Amino acid sequence: VRLTLDGDWTATTTDEPLRSTPRFDFPGQCVRIAEYADVEGWQRFLGETFGSQEWLWDAPDELRFDRAGRELVGAGFRLPYECAAAEDSARVPVTPAVRPGGLRADEARDFRLDVATELCRAPGDTELTCLRDVDVLDEPLEACIGIASDVALLVQHGTVVGWSLTDPVRYLTTGFAAPDPASPSPAVRSLFSECLDLVTQPLLDQVRGRDPAALARLRAADETLRAQREDRRRADALLSLIGNLVED
């Protein structure tokens, strides 16, 4: 299947998804899928590959391809700050089923992959679906390409219109660190939903506006995270951002 990612920039699907474990950097509000483990490794990776990447003040999503075989070798997606209305999130299609696969660029040149603007949250935040805009929900999806474990590109009319992350709590981390391989605790799953409320619109505006009720929720989340004993690495990932908001 041939996909359009930016104007006349196209790629063809393959049967080889990425083998790297996704990393949901909660303080950075982004999902990374690649082998690098620090900033220096990331910069080397960008120099050795082509595709979509940050440049100066422009920060699109990342899809990176190797120069030899033009195969997809890494990805990075930014989480939108704007939560879709509940009625829109309820319209996120459950079909078609995710088909594991990769991408091969049709030519070796850079392009720009726009970030998603709408965050659709499934009940219990079991899945996060990030869309170009809510108009995508007016028509069915053509394909869901599972480019990595629990990460899929969403395709409509031959164009990538968004991405999804299933079981996001499992992949929580900070920076470039690998996520905890153990299963998430029920307590941290619940705290994740509360924290995601606090760092996305509309509640984020209330926090920044110093609304008393919103600040009370923020401080309660901060205290609960600090007291959390099990699943400490994921709790610390959440606390990295929540603690900063409290200090601000």
Language-model segments: residues:
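C-terminal effector modules of nucleic-acid-centric enzymes and ribosome-associated factors
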Residues: 143, 167-168, 174
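Short, small/polar residue-rich loop motifs at catalytic or cofactor-binding pockets
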Residues: 59, 144-149
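A short acidic/small-residue loop/turn micro-motif
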Residues: 80-81, 168-170
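N-terminal intrinsically disordered, cationic/polar leader segments
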Residues: 134-142, 151
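Intrinsic disorder/low-complexity detector
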Residues: 1-50, 54-56, 61-65, 75-131, ...
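Generic structural signal for well-ordered beta-strand positions
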Residues: 73, 161-162
